[in-house]
């Protein structure tokens, strides 16, 4: 009230009224600007003006019990006068200093856990090494890069559910945590953050950094993995670069790198199998990368690479609409074309059937080490502007563009026959034939292309057929630029289809990707890749194939044994025996197979000749298409360790060694597993023990279905009959006893009855 009286008093004086009306501040617009709305219009001025006051801060009353009235220097820390319009206390900035020095200390145990990404960044920088600074023109191209090292790969929605569950577990709202990674992270974080006093909002922000991939479209020359991007401002300017080696790796970069390697291996392997698409899917579903299922990573990881995109397409996921040719990503930026089949003659008079694109089109081409802009018409290159790291990279881009243009002079530059094949020994399509041909040697192509005088354009220079730069002349339509071409920024994903030969097409039928586009580069994965599929056994060489094949038979022996006696053909056709065939000398594969199949048939016919170990040992040889011959073998050859090694038909060898006492099988000296059943105990032991509670009725009776293994007998109901396969590969009919009392006598009768049933 005092203040208001004072103001009224002031207003009654004519001088006050004059000052307020005559000075320019009465401009209504200005007064409105600074007084309307809650948004501060000049924060820095407001801050300076506030801080110049004695008590610019307000705080809850209880702070007066925690802070003394005066500090050590005798300066007042808070005012006894209440803040006008609220029941808070007015406080001096000196109080903040006092609090920072003398206030209570909370537990810091949660800080490294919450601010994990920051702590890890500091460690990486501490251990990173910065090299010399070089001054040179930087060819930067904008790429979509990951700016947030050390994150998991959850989608925004998945992360939101995890954060809500961790930070606000009691809030209402449906949250369904479904994926493996969501559940693991939630459990881990809840444990880490027990009794955490950091504000929930801050915790939520920091969790988001840890869980979600954040990407930006940034100009980059050099490394694009997130540990390089976080120091982009330190490593490259407009005309300089600083060498840098990160002081640590992060899992997200490792996942991206390992995913690419796994996908390339899988696509290459699938391409040579009988049904590439089915094989690819089987391998993707049975592979783990760093302990996470590959299919889960593919669903979440936005990496764009040819092999990765083929795997995604096979799983029915959307991929980028750009297409790949010669290792470059092409994105059409304008124009359109229609396809028409045309027959053309090469310089060697070989006929090629080309799918010619008719119409004017412009493309950006982005590769690992070079980029370009390409303008073309029907079978004519109009202009190509290339930029690249070095001469080799520029050559690669020019060759790809010239082939892509489908110009006649390119086709006429072919010398010799085109007969390139893919990994499965199938002829490549004509465009890839041409590409391979000129990638091997582009000399004739460049010589035949033709040259033209050029105008002097800033930042552009000509290039001659021998790859020397020139300011006067250049290959027709081709220029080299200092500036890179940005990657296509649009991250839209489109629905695609894939055929059984792994060719990926968009909805208009244009081929975006095919196995020919998958890089042959071999790398060493950062995370462990576990391929459970038998198709990938050969990735670690012949020894691995040998060991894995025998391990698989031993692991699945119960079912293998039944198939061996009931349905051998189905067993021989199992894909698990496919890799083994590459170890058997081609010329003799058929004879081995015929010999082993005949031997097995005798075992089935002549009772008592069933020999578990021999069946396991010879089974993989029976998988090849058999040739009928009267040849007998005492040993079979496999090609491992660079030479032929022998497996003895009867008895042990270094390749296949079974120890009867320990029941362990070693293959090439490495453990291949233990046989759970005992192959040598005659009819009595195991079977009679297991057949307790069953009555043996006689020989096999097909009406009661296929033979069960001894392990499957437990599922029978009392009084139910079934055929059962006993250790010797013989099948008998049994019935589960209706009463338990007579079980003891069963094991004695079983032995006699088995003998009778067999004989």
Swiss-Prot record:
It comes from the Viruses. A motif (Nuclear localization signal) lies at residues 736-739. The record marks 627 as: Mammalian adaptation. GO terms for biological process: 7-methylguanosine mRNA capping; cap snatching; DNA-templated transcription; symbiont-mediated suppression of host cytoplasmic pattern recognition receptor signaling pathway via inhibition of MAVS activity; symbiont-mediated suppression of host gene expression; symbiont-mediated suppression of host mRNA transcription via inhibition of RNA polymerase II activity; viral RNA genome replication. Influenza RNA polymerase is composed of three subunits: PB1, PB2 and PA. Interacts (via N-terminus) with PB1 (via C-terminus). Interacts with nucleoprotein NP (via N-terminus). Interacts (via N-terminus) with host MAVS (via N-terminus); this interaction inhibits host innate immune response. It is found in: Virion; Host nucleus; Host mitochondrion. Plays an essential role in transcription initiation and cap-stealing mechanism, in which cellular capped pre-mRNAs are used to generate primers for viral transcription. Recognizes and binds the 7-methylguanosine-containing cap of the target pre-RNA which is subsequently cleaved after 10-13 nucleotides by the viral protein PA. Plays a role in the initiation of the viral genome replication and modulates the activity of the ribonucleoprotein (RNP) complex. Belongs to the influenza viruses PB2 family. One of its GO terms (cellular component) is host cell nucleus. This is Polymerase basic protein 2. InterPro entries: Flu_PB2_2nd, Flu_PB2_6th, Flu_PB2_C, Flu_PB2_CAP-bd, Flu_PB2_middle, Flu_PB2_N, INV_PB2, PB2_helical.
């Amino acid at each position: 009230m005092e203040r208001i009286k004072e103001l009224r008093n002031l207003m009654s004086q004519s001088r006050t009224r004059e000052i307020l009306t005559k000075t320019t501040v009465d401009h209504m617009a200005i007064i409105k600007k600074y007084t309307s709305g809650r948004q501060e219009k000049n924060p820095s001025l407001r801050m300076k003006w506030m801080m110049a006051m004695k008590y610019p801060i307000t705080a809850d009353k209880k702070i007066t019990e925690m802070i003394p009235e005066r500090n050590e220097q005798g300066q007042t820390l808070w005012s006894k006068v209440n803040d006008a319009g609220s029941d808070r206390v007015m406080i001096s900035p000196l109080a903040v200093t006092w609090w920072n020095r003398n206030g209570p200390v909370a537990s810091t145990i949660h800080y490294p856990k919450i601010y994990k990404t920051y702590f890890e960044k500091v460690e990486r920088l501490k251990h990173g090494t910065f090299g010399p600074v070089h001054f040179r023109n930087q060819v930067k191209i904008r790429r979509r890069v990951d700016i947030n090292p050390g994150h998991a790969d959850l989608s925004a929605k998945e992360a939101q559910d995890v954060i809500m569950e961790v930070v606000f577990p009691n809030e209402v709202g449906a949250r369904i945590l479904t994926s493996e990674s969501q559940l693991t992270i939630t459990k881990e974080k809840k444990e880490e953050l027990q009794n955490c006093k950091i504000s929930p909002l801050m915790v939520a922000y920091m969790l988001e950094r840890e869980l979600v991939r954040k990407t930006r479209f940034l100009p980059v020359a050099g490394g694009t993995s997130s540990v390089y991007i976080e120091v982009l401002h330190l490593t490259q300017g407009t005309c300089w670069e600083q060498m840098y080696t990160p002081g640590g790796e992060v899992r997200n970069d490792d996942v991206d790198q390992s995913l690419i390697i796994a996908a390339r291996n899988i696509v290459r392997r699938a391409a040579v199998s009988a049904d590439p698409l089915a094989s690819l899917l089987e391998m993707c579903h049975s592979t783990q990368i760093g302990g996470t299922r590959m299919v889960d990573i593919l669903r979440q990881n936005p990496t764009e690479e040819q092999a990765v995109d083929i795997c995604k397409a096979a799983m029915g996921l959307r991929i980028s609409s750009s297409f790949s040719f010669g290792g470059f990503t092409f994105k059409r930026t304008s124009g359109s074309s229609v396809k028409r089949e045309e027959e053309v003659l090469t310089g060697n008079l070989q006929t090629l059937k080309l799918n010619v694109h008719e119409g004017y089109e412009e493309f950006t081409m982005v590769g690992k080490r070079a980029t370009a802009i390409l303008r073309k018409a029907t079978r004519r290159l109009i202009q190509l502007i290339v930029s690249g790291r070095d001469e080799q990279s520029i050559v690669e881009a020019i060759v790809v563009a010239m082939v892509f243009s489908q110009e006649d002079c390119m086709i006429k530059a072919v010398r010799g026959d085109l007969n390139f094949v893919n990994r499965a020994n199938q002829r490549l399509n004509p465009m890839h034939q041409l590409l391979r041909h000129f990638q091997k040697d582009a000399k004739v192509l460049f010589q035949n292309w033709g040259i033209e005088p050029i105008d002097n354009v800033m930042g552009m220079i000509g290039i001659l057929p021998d790859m020397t730069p020139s300011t006067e002349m250049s290959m027709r339509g081709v220029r080299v630029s200092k500036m890179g071409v940005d990657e296509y920024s649009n991250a839209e994903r489109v629905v695609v289809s894939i055929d059984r030969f792994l060719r990926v097409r968009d909805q208009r039928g244009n081929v975006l990707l095919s196995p020919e586009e998958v890089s042959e580069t071999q790398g060493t994965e950062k995370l462990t890749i576990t391929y459970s599929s038998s198709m990938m056994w050969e990735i670690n060489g012949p020894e691995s194939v040998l060991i894995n094949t025998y391990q698989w038979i031993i692991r699945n022996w119960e079912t293998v044994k039944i198939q061996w006696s009931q349905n051998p053909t189905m067993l021989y056709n199992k894909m698990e025996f496919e890799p083994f065939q590459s170890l058997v000398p081609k010329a003799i594969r058929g004879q081995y197979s015929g010999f082993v199949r005949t031997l097995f048939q005798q075992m089935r016919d002549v009772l008592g000749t069933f020999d578990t170990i021999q069946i396991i040992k010879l089974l993989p040889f029976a998988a090849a298409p058999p040739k009928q011959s009267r040849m007998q073998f005492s040993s079979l050859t496999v090609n491992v360790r660079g030479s032929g090694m022998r497996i003895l038909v009867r008895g042990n060898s270094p390749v296949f060694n079974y120890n009867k006492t320990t029941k362990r099988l070693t293959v090439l000296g490495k453990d291949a597993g233990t046989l759970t059943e005992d192959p040598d105990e005659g009819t009595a032991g195991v079977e009679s023990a297991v057949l307790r509670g069953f009555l043996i009725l006689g020989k096999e009776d097909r009406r009661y279905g296929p033979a069960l293994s001894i392990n499957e007998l437990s599922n029978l109901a009392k009084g139910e009959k079934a055929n059962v396969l006993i250790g010797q590969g013989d099948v008998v009919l049994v019935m589960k006893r209706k009463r338990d009392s007579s079980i003891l006598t069963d094991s004695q009768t079983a032995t006699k009855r088995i003998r009778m049933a067999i004989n």
